Amino acid sequence: MDQTVIYNGQILTLTRFWATGEPCLWITDPEQIGMPKMEFVGGPPDEYCIFLKNLTETEVAQITSLDGAPLDMKEELRQL
């Protein structure tokens, strides 16, 4: 199940990339395409995401819930 999260001060959607099933952070606003490690993944001009595999452990630890609480990413990924 997708989850709305905060990463690097931006609201993104934690999900799995539709083509490969890889976990990623999907944009919620077209202005987010300039974020570090954001990649164009095809389709309409708004299909961009950050693949979690491209983030360091420190960067992954910065992904929080909307209320700022740290997430257990292993558990979150299991539930996706």
Predicted regions and their residues:
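Detector for methionine-enriched segments
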Residues: 1, 35-38, 73
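Charged low-complexity stretches with an acidic bias
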Residues: 69-77
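Short intrinsically disordered terminal tails
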Residues: 1-2, 77-80
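Acidic, low-complexity, intrinsically disordered interaction modules
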Residues: 14-66
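Short, isolated positions in well-ordered beta-strands
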Residues: 12-14, 71
